[in-house]
Amino acid sequence: MPNPLFDALFAPLAGQDRPLLHLAGGQQLTAAAFVALVERLAAALQALGVAPGDRVAAQVAKSPEALALYGATVAVGAVFLPLNTGYTAAEVDYFVGNATPRVFVGDPADAAALAPVCAAHGAQLMGLSAQGTGSLLDLAAQQDAAFAPVDRTGGDLAAILYTSGTTGRSKGAMLSHDNLLSNARVLADLWRFTPEDVLLHALPIFHTHGLFVASNVSLLTGGQMAFLPGFDLDAVQAALPKSTVMMGVPTFYTRLLDDPRLTRDRVGHMRLFISGSAPLLSETHIAFEARTGMRILERYGMTETNMNTSNPYEGDRRAGTVGLPLPGVDLRLMADGLPVAEGEVGVIEVRGPNVFQGYWQMPDKTAEDLRPDGWFITGDLATRDADGYITIVGRAKDLVITGGLNVYPKEVEEVLDTLPGVAESAVIGLPHPDFGEAVFAILVRAKDAEPDLAAIRAAVDARLAKFKQPKAYAVVDALPRNTMGKVQKAALRQSYADRFKA
């Protein structure tokens, strides 16, 4: 019986005694043991009454058992719904109410807070701890190891992943077996993954990057993973000499650069470093190459689409760009309903087998963002150069319109980030009585120097047109970010909303 995602990612592991997961404590889990765990968890889900199409929500710490729960959900034909482990019970209430999962798997330590939420929405609460214990594992241990996956088609839903955006209510992106599998196959081929690879996996698995990119690609190609519970600098440094590929967010790379242990010898066994989920500063790209001799490969994707573009494996990996559209993915830049010229800013729209099926229980929002002919309006602004490379310049929602003129925050941020005393910056638009919106810059002070605002104003005046220059500045120790490192500009706009009020 076909079950596309299970057949491609999990079934081939059966009977293989090779290591699959290398854990932080030095333990290993073989491929055969892992798939046996998947099958027992699948039987446990069926024992709980989970039927094809039901949702299984998981708010659990990263562990082999948590990854196996994903496989088990796929195996029974249900829809996997991973949730950020940082959400409070009050926040979880929205997701459980919206998705109405049959089963909610949470940390046993949070049971008292989660129980009323699950009861209110008819979800059965089961426990799974970071140590691989809890009521779900107890039930799985009672099940027969033999399990036959449930029939599914490529168009059936495999997951609902809620957007980790920086504005508004999270939306549940519905992803099919074909959405996930087509993207994993393209990336595995493009990035040259083989069974000989060892992926250094320090990402969370409640997000598309850690689960549907990193884990799916590695499982698909039969490699191994150094499966770390999170980014711990010592653990990552220890794993680097034994790994071949690392996927990370920009923060991973800046932390590595701050550590003198990062040397060419340390990464001598590595063939590829990949970055995504948030913009990688050109300075980080350049500094990493200078230190290690290796150029980070940056790519671009979204919860709704998985990956859309990538810098090439062989060829020019251009700092500041997210590369070229993936094979099979159509990408266009639009403004006022028309394609923009080369070098002009437009909203990215994509179409391809990776594009999601719509937003769960949000038909109006789906119709707004997903055209009938398959084009998805991403809301990201970008330019395309003569060679086809895409450069993200920001979110359409972050565009500042001051006195009727458009200001793209990234252009201003790129100037500010090069100035003495500035570690990084965020530029936003704030309500202004004369201009409608005014450009406002939040500067993160550098470790070794305080920003000199007079000098910064002079430097900006020499490099940017008057209308692009910040009307005022704030200096802070850090910017607010979501779990994947994206700056939360909506929070900044709220914090400074009254700055220019008359």
State the predicted function of each range.
Residues D17, Q143-Y162, R169, R192-V198:
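Conserved pre-ATP/AMP-binding loop-to-beta segment of ANL
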Residues T30-A32, A158-S182:
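Conserved AMP-binding A3 loop
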Residues Y87, F104, G352, Q357-G358, ...:
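AMP-binding/adenylate-forming catalytic core of the ANL superfamily
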Residues A109-G154:
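ANL superfamily adenylate-forming
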Residues Q27, A43-Y87, N406:
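Conserved AMP-binding/adenylate-forming
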Residues L324-G328, L338-D369, L405-V407:
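Conserved ATP/PPi-binding loop(s) of AMP-dependent carboxylate-activating enzymes
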Residues L181-V198, F206-V245, D259-R261:
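Conserved AMP-binding/adenylation subdomain of ANL enzymes
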Residues S243-G248, L257-R317, D330, G337:
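Gly/Ser/Thr-rich phosphate-binding loop
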